[in-house]
Amino acid sequence: MSKIIEGLKYSETHEWVKIEGGIAIIGVTDFAQKEMGDITYVDMPAEEDEVNAGEEFGALESVKASSDLICPVSGEVCEVNAELEDSPELINSDPYANWIIKVKISDESELDALMDAAAYAAQIGE
């Protein structure tokens, strides 16, 4: 079974979101990293880039596949996880500790479209 954290929000495209004071911390779920296999590269936006809910903001590459990252919220990228540039495999070791980007949310109502832990577990059949 995949690890799913209570208190986070989840997208249908397997990104998780943690909200801290108007900032969305975004990463990929345990389910996603297991499906991808060993992650070898993370493509991330630059700080201060604008991102939009439902649109691509980067990609993960693994030995098995490449997968677009879809942003669950709109806003301005305020931080990227630079550790992932040299060590993308950190996502495999702990996808919830190793976030990808932080976004200053421009429309908090977009969070309503995301799933809670129970709904996400049902979506992935766990």
Q: What feature does the model see in each segment?
A:
Residues 1-56, 93-126:
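Acidic, low-complexity mobile loops and tails
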Residues 44-96, 105:
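Structured functional modules or segments
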